[in-house]
Structures are given as C-alpha cells and as structure tokens.
C-alpha cells in the first residue's frame, strides 16, 4: 500500500505540474520574430564525472545542423534569457551552490524506487520535450549571430525574508525534485543520441544553477520580485572574442499578470570595429579646444570670436577668462564680449569652384560683348562720318566744276596785271565815320598781358594775364570783360606759364582753346570756368587755332615749327604732326582758311607763319594735309593774319637792312594747276602799309571787313614808336585813323557788341575800347 501510494503521488504530482505549470519564459528573438513555444522549467544538474544529459535549455535556440538534434548549448554561442517563473504560485528560483544540490539529489535517486507508471509518464514527457526541441531548433537564429550574456535581475523585498525561509525552501525543494530525480534516473537507461564533439563542450561549458524555493502565504503580499539568471561562458577565448567585436544582446522578460509576457530589448552596444567618421566630416562639428562636438543649445553651443574662428561657448569662455586673452588658433587679442553665439547646427565649406569658374566665364563673356558693342558703335559712327564727308565732297566737286567753267578764261598769267586787278577789286572807304574812344579797363596792374580774343556767344572779351594772387595761386589765366555792360568779370586760372594763343570755337558755346609756354594745350568752358581737357604737347606752344571745316579738330604750333593736330574725341595725344618744310622756327601764328570761301581760291587749310617763312597746309580727303610753301621775303616775320571771306592775308615784317620801318604787306591767296593737274597754292602782294622804325615786341595786327559793310577791308597795325594803333584802308592804302594808347599796342581785336562795331587794343596792363560812330 505504501508503495502504491508513493506511485500515485509521483504520477499525480508530475501530471499536475505538467498540466498546471504556466509557461515560465518567453524567448524574445533578436530579429523581431514571434516568440516560440517554451519547455517546462526543469532542473539541470551538472556532474563533473557523469556524461552529459539531455538538457532543455530555457529560452535558447539550438543549432540547425544535419543529423539528430540534441538539446544542448550551441557551440560558441552565448544565449541570454530572462525568466520569471512562478511555481505553484509560491515557488521562487534562486542561484544556490551546485555542490549542495548534488548531495541532496543523490540519495533521492538511490533510495527511491521508480514505479512503471512513472516511467510511462516520463517517456511521454521526454517525447514532448524532443518535439519541442525540434521546434526550437527550427526557430533558432543563425550561428554567426553573436549574442551576449543576458541578466534577469531579481530584487527581494527584504534580506530578512530570505533568511527566514531558507530551511523551508530546502525541504520543499527536496520534495519537488523527487519526480525529476526519477526522470533523470530513467533517462540514463534510454539510448543516448550522439552528442557534439568534446571540443565544442570544452569551448562552451555551461553552468546553470537552479533552486526551487517556496515561501509561506504571508510572503505573497510582499513587493514584486525580479529574478536574475546569469549565463556566462567560462572559456577565455569566448570572453576575448566577445570583448573584441561581439554584439551583446541583453533581453529582459517580465511576467505580467495573467501569464502574458512583454519583451524588452536593451539597445545594442556600439561595435568598435565599424568604420569611424572621417576627420573631414568632423571638422565642422568639433570644438578645437576640447575636441568635443559642439551643440546648438546649452553651455557648449556653437560660438565664434571676432576673428571668425569657431569654438564651444563654455570652452572659449573659460579660455578668455584665463590669462591668455587671445584666440587659441590665430593668437589675435580677444575678450569675453567678442563671443558671438551662432545659431547653426553644423558647418560645412561649400565647394564653389565650379560657381567661380562659371562666374569668371560670365564676366569674360560680358566683357567681350561690351567690346563688340563698342566696336559696332564705332563702326556706325565712322560710317556716318564717311557718309557726311562723301556728301560734302560731292557738293564741293560740283561747286569746283562750276567755278572752273566760269573763271577759266579770267586767270591771268601776269603777276602785275593780277596785282592791278586786285587793287581795283578792293573798294575804298569814302565815308567820314571812324572809331571813337569809349572806355579803358585795367586788366593787370603788374602788366605781362599778351593776347586777347572775343566770344560772340557770351558777349565778352577775354584777355590773358598773370594770376592776381601769384603768392597763393601762381600761373596765368584769363579775365573776362563783359561788353554788354562794359564791366570786368572774374579771373579764370588756366596755365602755369604765359599764354601765347587764344581761340573760341564757332560751334561750341563758351569753349576756349588756349596755348601756353608750359607745353600744354587746354580746352576751358567759360560757362563753368573749368578746364575740361588738357593735351601735353611736349614742347612750348606758341599758337593755336580751330579747324573751321572739321569742328572736332584743333591745331597747335610748337616752338620747333611743327604743327600738332588733335581730335577732341581722342583725349590721349595728337593724331598728326605736320613737320616744317624749311627752318625750324617758332610758329608765331596759325590761321585757318575754310574751303570754297572764294572762287579765286576754293581750297581750305591752315596758314602757318614762323619767324622765317610761311606755309599753307592744304586739307585733303581723309583729313590729310599737303604743304605749300608760300613765296615770301625770308626772315623778319612777326605775325600772320587772314580774312576768310576775301582770301587775303596780312604779313608783318620787322625793320631790316633793306627796310627801315615796320611793314605790313597785304597778300592775296591764289593757285594754279601743274602738269599733273594738281593745284599749287601761292600768294602775291596787294598792298603795303608802313609803320614806325622800331619793332621789339611780337605785336599782332588785324584785317577785317569795314563796319559800313560796303565790301571794303580795313587793316589795323600797331606802332611801337608812337604807342598807337594805325587804321588803314586796304583798297587805297591810305591811313584812316591813329588810335592813341599809353603803351605799345600788343594785340588788336574787332568785335560786334550791342549792335555796334567796336575795336579793342591791348597794352601790357590795359584794354582800350573804341566804338565805330
């Protein structure tokens, strides 16, 4: 009876444990799959001398290899599981000494006989475990997946409660292990499946300690307890491989009321063998003081100094609070107030090489386009100029053809007959009107006045003079004298040395051309009293004039007899240089004769007179010049003046050994055709006017139309001996009037003012105004 009761108790206890035992743990797959079925919790007994037993490893996958399957730890694998098991409501799992457990189980297997019914139930239980093992092997992850140790921690409510229940736990543990001891005794009689190699067992020994304990009903009301099962590999090589590069997966499984389990996977540790971030990527994220990443908020946020270098705010603040108040990178002086917080997460240097290359290409293309547009505009302007010149030349050819037909038979071959006819063509002034003195202007108290000219557009007389404040503003300029109210105006500074030539443009209002001994030619606007253009001739300039056929060109006579031609559109230098044909003497006078002004002389050009001779530079097509040397007496020339309407010129000679007095010779310009059909320009004397016996100054004369507009010509010359200006009738050669002055007359200028004809004479200090009445 006692034996049957024992068999019944064993069978009933085993069936009860199989039927009512809750699933102790849930295997959480590291790959995120569904949890597999788990075997019942069993006690694994490690024996050093016995062969390895069939052991179901809780929450551990097995290796999927060809051949019979074994419930044993996989080679070179470390499986970590967390289990929280409730055995019959009050059982607890606790790590105990494996030696004590072995001593407690050995008497149980030896002294207690196992009934046949218990063996049948054990066999069915083993077959179920084998089927479960096959399922676990199917769900096991690959063998190359490294899994680290997993710890399930259990926290006891109090240390005193464990000490009180030690005795009862050992008793209950002995009773609860009786069926399991019978199971392991029977399993020794079963045929063993081939196990893995001894080498794998040596490399991966598994030591598991399990102790089942129960407590009284009063302990069930205490706080929740957490269990910790630590599965660690004892092999040194496994530990080394785990420390070098294995990824440790730590899983915690917590039992929730009702038998449900919630997986909780801890974050994986960083693998040190992964490729690190390159230094180039970290340059924009790292503080150069602490070599840590700066942040976009907090104490270590991105900051910059005035020099532009970047640091963490906390680091650079500490740095500047120390003794070295300089930038850590460039050693520039800095202070705490120079710190500027930058609202940027990271910094990256943008590669703009392609952009800069495209930008330079764009600038080059724009420059080429502007250059092409400028060339196109210049070509259009040249086309317009050539078109106008072509039309002018066409009209000129027609006029010349008409004049040639009309005057071909009238050209005389005898100079004497031509002179007689020229004298007869100049009518004499028969009326009794003459010039009356009106006013005197003191230009310069210190003297040194030299030349004057008149501007019709501004109704003013312009006189050259030295600076009135030579100590503050040295040099020479002009003074404007208004002919409307007969009052002097302001002084306009222009040159550094004495002015030798003045001329107004007939097309530009108030634009004055001046030549000076300071080797410059200047254009001055008298409307704004400013110099608008300066040309450096390189040598002292003695005379100047405007081109009446081409308003954009001017002439400048140099001290060596050369003539420089300037284009106002070219502000750099002259465009032509006309070299003298004979002696290199200063050009004392330049006068321009326009084209087709007279039937007797239709050619245009500039008349240049030096101290030795005179030349006429004919203006050809393409703005080229052809020289014609005029037949004149050699030496002694002091002035050349022209009258454009009648083509007459006035030449003044000094007294010489053949002539005792000053002479002013009126000449007529003429031409004849050579064998090649080219014109040869010349001049012949018409009338001679005599003056005083002295001529020390380079005085200027004047030739102009009679104010009566009767076609007669008047000539006015200066006489140094009498300090006066002599007025002559060009037709009769008679002296009409003598205009007295206090000093020798240096220049003479006729002009029209207030519907009256006036004449101005210039001495070294004053200007005398005479009116025709």
Curated annotation (Swiss-Prot):
Q: What is known of its domains?
A: The coiled coil domain may be involved in RPA2-binding.
* Processing after translation: Phosphorylated at Ser-46 and Ser-63 upon DNA damage by ATM or ATR. ATM phosphorylation occurs at early times upon DNA damage, while ATR is the major kinase at later times. Phosphorylation by ATM and ATR is required to stabilize p53/TP53. Part of the phosphorylation depends upon RPA2 presence.
Q: What is the lineage of its organism?
A: Eukaryota, Metazoa, Chordata, Craniata, Vertebrata
Cite the GO molecular-function annotations of the record. Answer: MDM2/MDM4 family protein binding; p53 binding; ubiquitin protein ligase activity; zinc ion binding
Pathway annotation: Protein modification; protein ubiquitination
What's the protein here called? E3 ubiquitin-protein ligase RFWD3
Can you say where in the cell this protein is located? Nucleus; Nucleus, PML body; Cytoplasm
Q: Which GO terms describe its biological process?
A: DNA damage response; double-strand break repair via homologous recombination; interstrand cross-link repair; mitotic G1 DNA damage checkpoint signaling; protein ubiquitination; regulation of DNA damage checkpoint; replication fork processing; response to ionizing radiation
Q: Which residue ranges are recorded for the region named Disordered?
A: 18-67, 92-117, 139-230, 259-279
Q: What reaction gets catalysed by this protein?
A: S-ubiquitinyl-[E2 ubiquitin-conjugating enzyme]-L-cysteine + [acceptor protein]-L-lysine = [E2 ubiquitin-conjugating enzyme]-L-cysteine + N(6)-ubiquitinyl-[acceptor protein]-L-lysine
Entry annotated with the keyword Zinc: yes
InterPro entries given in the database record: RFWD3, WD40/YVTN_repeat-like_dom_sf, WD40_repeat_dom_sf, WD40_RFWD3, WD40_rpt, Znf_RING, Znf_RING/FYVE/PHD
State where composition is biased (Polar residues): 186-205, 263-273
State the protein's purpose.
E3 ubiquitin-protein ligase required for the repair of DNA interstrand cross-links (ICL) in response to DNA damage. Plays a key role in RPA-mediated DNA damage signaling and repair. Acts by mediating ubiquitination of the RPA complex (RPA1, RPA2 and RPA3 subunits) and RAD51 at stalled replication forks, leading to remove them from DNA damage sites and promote homologous recombination. Also mediates the ubiquitination of p53/TP53 in the late response to DNA damage, and acts as a positive regulator of p53/TP53 stability, thereby regulating the G1/S DNA damage checkpoint.
At the top level of its lineage, which domain of life is listed?
Answer: Eukaryota
Assembly notes:
Interacts with MDM2 and p53/TP53. Binds to the RPA complex via direct interaction with RPA2. Interacts with RAD51.
A single cellular component GO annotation: nucleus
State the UniProt keywords alphabetically.
Answer: Coiled coil, Cytoplasm, DNA damage, DNA repair, Metal-binding, Nucleus, Phosphoprotein, Repeat, Transferase, Ubl conjugation pathway, WD repeat, Zinc, Zinc-finger
């Amino acid at each position: 009876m006692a034996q049957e009761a024992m068999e019944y108790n064993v069978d009933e206890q085993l069936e009860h444990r199989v039927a009512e035992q809750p699933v102790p743990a849930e295997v959480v797959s590291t790959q995120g799959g569904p949890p597999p079925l788990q075997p019942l919790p069993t006690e694994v007994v490690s024996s050093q001398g016995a062969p390895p037993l069939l052991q179901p490893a809780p929450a551990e996958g097995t290796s999927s290899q060809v051949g019979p399957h074994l419930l044993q730890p996989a080679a070179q694998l470390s499986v970590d599981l967390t289990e929280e098991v409730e055995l019959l409501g009050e059982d607890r799992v606790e790590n105990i000494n494996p030696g004590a457990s072995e001593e407690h189980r050995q008497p149980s297997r030896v002294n207690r006989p196992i009934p046949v019914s218990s063996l049948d139930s054990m066999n069915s239980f083993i077959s179920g475990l084998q089927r479960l093992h096959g399922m676990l092997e199917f769900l096991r992850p690959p063998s190359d997946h490294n899994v680290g140790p997993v710890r399930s921690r259990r926290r006891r409510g109090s240390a005193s409660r464990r000490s009180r229940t030690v005795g009862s736990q050992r008793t209950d543990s002995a009773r609860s292990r009786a069926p399991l001891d019978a199971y392991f005794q029977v399993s020794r009689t079963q045929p063993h499946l081939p196990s893995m190699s001894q080498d794998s067992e040596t490399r991966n020994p598994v030591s598991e300690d399990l102790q089942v304990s129960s407590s009284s009903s009063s302990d069930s009301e205490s706080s929740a307890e957490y269990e910790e099962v630590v599965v660690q590999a004892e092999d040194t090589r496994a530990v080394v491989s785990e420390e070098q590069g294995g990824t440790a997966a730590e899983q915690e499984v917590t039992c929730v009321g009702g038998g449900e389990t919630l997986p909780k996977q801890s974050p994986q540790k960083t693998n040190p063998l992964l490729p690190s971030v390159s230094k180039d990527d970290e340059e924009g994220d790292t503080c150069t003081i602490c070599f840590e990443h700066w942040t976009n908020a907090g104490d270590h946020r991105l900051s910059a100094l005035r020099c532009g270098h970047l640091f963490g705010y906390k680091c650079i603040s500490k740095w500047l609070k120390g003794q070295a108040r300089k930038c850590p990178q460039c050693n520039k002086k800095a202070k705490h107030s120079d710190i500027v917080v930058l609202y940027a997460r990271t910094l990256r240097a943008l590669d703009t090489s392609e952009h800069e290359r495209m930008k330079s290409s764009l600038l080059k293309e724009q420059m080429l386009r502007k250059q092409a547009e400028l060339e196109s505009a210049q070509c259009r302007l040249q086309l317009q100029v050539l078109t106008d010149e072509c039309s002018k030349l066409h009209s000129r050819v027609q006029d010349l053809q008409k004049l040639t037909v009309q005057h071909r038979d009238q050209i005389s071959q005898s100079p004497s007959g031509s002179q007689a006819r020229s004298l007869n063509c100049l009518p004499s002034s028969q009326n009794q009107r003459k010039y009356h003195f009106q006013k005197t202007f003191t230009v310069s108290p210190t003297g040194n006045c030299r030349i004057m000219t008149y501007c019709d557009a501004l109704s003013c007389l312009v006189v050259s003079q030295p600076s009135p404040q030579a100590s503050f503003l040295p040099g020479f300029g002009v003074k404007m004298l208004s002919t409307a109210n007969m009052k002097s105006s302001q002084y306009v500074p222009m040159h550094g040395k004495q002015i030798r030539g003045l001329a107004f443009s007939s097309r530009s209002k108030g634009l004055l051309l001046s030549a000076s001994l300071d080797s410059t030619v200047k254009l001055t606007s008298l409307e704004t009293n400013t110099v608008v253009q300066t040309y450096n001739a390189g040598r002292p300039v003695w005379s100047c004039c405007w081109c009446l056929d081409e308003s954009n060109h001017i002439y400048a006579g140099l001290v060596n007899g050369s003539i420089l031609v300037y284009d106002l559109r070219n502000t750099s230098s002259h465009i032509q240089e006309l070299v003298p044909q004979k002696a290199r003497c200063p050009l004392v006078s330049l006068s321009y004769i326009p084209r087709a002004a007279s039937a007797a002389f239709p050619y245009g050009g500039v008349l240049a007179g030096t101290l030795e001779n005179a030349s006429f530079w004919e203006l050809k097509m393409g703005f080229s010049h052809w020289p014609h040397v005029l037949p004149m007496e050699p030496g002694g020339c002091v002035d050349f003046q022209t009258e454009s309407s009648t083509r007459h010129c006035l030449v003044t000679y000094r007294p010489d050994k053949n002539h005792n007095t000053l002479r002013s010779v009126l000449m007529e310009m003429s031409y004849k055709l050579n064998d090649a059909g080219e014109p040869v320009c010349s001049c012949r004397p018409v009338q001679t006017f005599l003056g005083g016996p002295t001529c020390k100054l380079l005085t200027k004369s004047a030739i102009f139309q009679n104010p009566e507009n009767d076609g007669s010509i008047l000539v006015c010359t200066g006489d140094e001996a009498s300090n006066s200006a002599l007025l002559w009738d060009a037709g009769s050669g008679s002296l009409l009037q003598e205009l007295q002055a206090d000093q020798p007359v240096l220049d003479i200028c006729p002009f029209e003012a207030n519907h009256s004809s006036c004449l101005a004479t210039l001495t070294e200090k004053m200007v005398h105004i005479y009116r025709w009445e």
